[in-house]
Amino acid sequence: MALARCVLAVILGALSVVARADPVSRSPLHRPHPSPPRSQHAHYLPSSRRPPRTPRFPLPLRIPAAQRPQVLSTGHTPPTIPRRCGAGESWGNATNLGVPCLHWDEVPPFLERSPPASWAELRGQPHNFCRSPDGSGRPWCFYRNAQGKVDWGYCDCGQGPALPVIRLVGGNSGHEGRVELYHAGQWGTICDDQWDNADADVICRQLGLSGIAKAWHQAHFGEGSGPILLDEVRCTGNELSIEQCPKSSWGEHNCGHKEDAGVSCVPLTDGVIRLAGGKSTHEGRLEVYYKGQWGTVCDDGWTEMNTYVACRLLGFKYGKQSSVNHFDGSNRPIWLDDVSCSGKEVSFIQCSRRQWGRHDCSHREDVGLTCYPDSDGHRLSPGFPIRLVDGENKKEGRVEVFVNGQWGTICDDGWTDKHAAVICRQLGYKGPARARTMAYFGEGKGPIHMDNVKCTGNEKALADCVKQDIGRHNCRHSEDAGVICDYLEKKASSSGNKEMLSSGCGLRLLHRRQKRIIGGNNSLRGAWPWQASLRLRSAHGDGRLLCGATLLSSCWVLTAAHCFKRYGNNSRSYAVRVGDYHTLVPEEFEQEIGVQQIVIHRNYRPDRSDYDIALVRLQGPGEQCARLSTHVLPACLPLWRERPQKTASNCHITGWGDTGRAYSRTLQQAAVPLLPKRFCKERYKGLFTGRMLCAGNLQEDNRVDSCQGDSGGPLMCEKPDESWVVYGVTSWGYGCGVKDTPGVYTRVPAFVPWIKSVTSL
């Protein structure tokens, strides 16, 4: 019995030793330590098959314990099966070939080469550590092979010191940003000296990001705030990590954070663009990616807006089209033609275009671009878009520039023909250029981007002239600058005067458009060549506009008698201007002529509106007073007692009067219908006489009327022979554009005998 007890004690002691020496023999559900509470940094299973979840870093290697997320044990692993390379701060993340592992959540669902074991439990994990998912073999990971395809490989668990931690900061996505390294316990940046696309290739490879690697300079993604860790990085592009590249020692540099380096690793998808064949990263032949192949873009219909969109998508703010001959040749397919962008696209293939591969071009027509960064606050980069708006043709208009995503205007302070020469040169025009000020082509509606622009006239682009900060100004849109390119001055000679005089009256020698003073719109220059204005001479004022008038011949002007009520009929107090368009801008066809004689109808009384008509004789020898030209021509007189409602059509009023907001600086025009005599009598009762007529649109939403500044101006109607006849002189009315109160005009046909007796016309 004693012997049996001894044998039993020996057996139990042996089993106890074995149990203590082999904890693996316990049930896999047994935990030798108390289970810790759940944490956002750990994921728990009732077995050791799933590795702990860790927060994702771009390359999660070697982070000090104080800054590492807590990693808790999930159980014991047999020492004969290495489930992962290293532990804690030295986990492995490269194959035994030295190629970086892909993140588990970046592996596509379909693979050409199957891995050694199921990896379903790792699918979607936000890290790239080597693992043996089923615990049955060596740790492995996915990587991208030399052909760019996803493959798998075993990991080298003795890979030594971990690579530096890298992250991208300040970009719009995880594929771009300022490059930052983690070294000696803190994040820091890289100086952009020698920084190029080869360096970007290595960074993208080390991060496990595929696609187009592009280097960025001058703190493109913003300035960092930590130390500058590296300088003079000179990778060949074939290295597996930045550690393998020639570079400065850690912490050695001669830079500031304005030179922080950045990269973008753009995924290769259809519509991605790049610049190729240039001497730098910001210039080259424009190429677009489609179905696994790069191709070029034909320049048919290419515009500045297309350039802006392409450069913006490439990360720049502006650009200009460059000759493709400046860049290396291409034997790639021509993918796109007839591209037209609106400026709002977020992908190049959102621009209007032909179908992929449809074109009628050769590579001599490939689009070449040079892109530029944003303004630095003092000047704009060459090539930012400019345009001319609201001119009569594409060679003239209000100057607008595209800055920070918005079209805006330029203030006309100091604006001269030298500025116009630069604008026209940038737009490709080589002829004479003329500046226009005071919103000559109308007021813009966007921001005012520039003021106090200074040009010598020799600059290639407006950007070279800008001296004041973008957006700083002390102007309103009434001071918007404009230009006329390829300007041709056409003044009539004396022989030309005789030709025009002999050819008759009421001729419009320039193109016309019929738009609608209240309810009206700007006229074209020269569209109403008989339009004149009566002005005060400086002895009585500042030469300001008093009334409109109508040129009847080189020496006679028709206007309203009430225009002389305030300042009398002394001819030396007045001047007449003809050929005018913008009241504040001197123009080549404009003439200001003194007054020799004022003839007011003898029946006119200042306290009444009847007989409101006057004639003005201009100063000049014989019958040569105003020089006639395409912009200065006489109107025709009607027949005596002619009834314009039956013989005329297409009637217009013109002038610089009240537009509903203010007095206009540019000549206004408005189409108005002549109204029946009975209608006018009903509205104005005894105030309306047989020597008057009324006209105007009476609808609530379409009222057009002449106002105070247009007094004395013409009411013109077109005859069937296309000559224009003055049927009315703007006289009076109840306000401007008031409902059911049309403008009243002196009926010119009733005064034809008197006009001819005074003027001998």
Swiss-Prot record:
InterPro entries recorded: Kringle, Kringle-like, Kringle_CS, Kringle_sf, Peptidase_S1_PA, Peptidase_S1_PA_chymotrypsin, Peptidase_S1A, SRCR
Peptidase S1 domain residues: 517-760
Subcellular localization(s) per the UniProt record: Secreted
A GO CC term assigned to this protein in UniProt: glutamatergic synapse
Domain Kringle: 85-157
Coiled coil: none
Site feature (Reactive bond homolog) residues: 516-517
Organism: Mus musculus
Enzyme Commission number(s): 3.4.21.-
GO BP terms in the entry: exocytosis; proteolysis; zymogen activation
Organs and tissues of expression: Most abundant in cerebral cortex, hippocampus and amygdala.
Biased composition (Low complexity): 38-48
Region (Zymogen activation region) residue spans: 505-516
Official protein name in the record: Neurotrypsin
Stated role: Plays a role in neuronal plasticity and the proteolytic action may subserve structural reorganizations associated with learning and memory operations.
Domain SRCR: 166-267, 273-373, 386-487
Catalytic machinery residues: 562 (charge relay system), 612 (charge relay system), 711 (charge relay system)
Disordered: annotated segments: 25-87
Keyword match Glycoprotein: yes
Organism placement in taxonomy: Eukaryota, Metazoa, Chordata, Craniata, Vertebrata
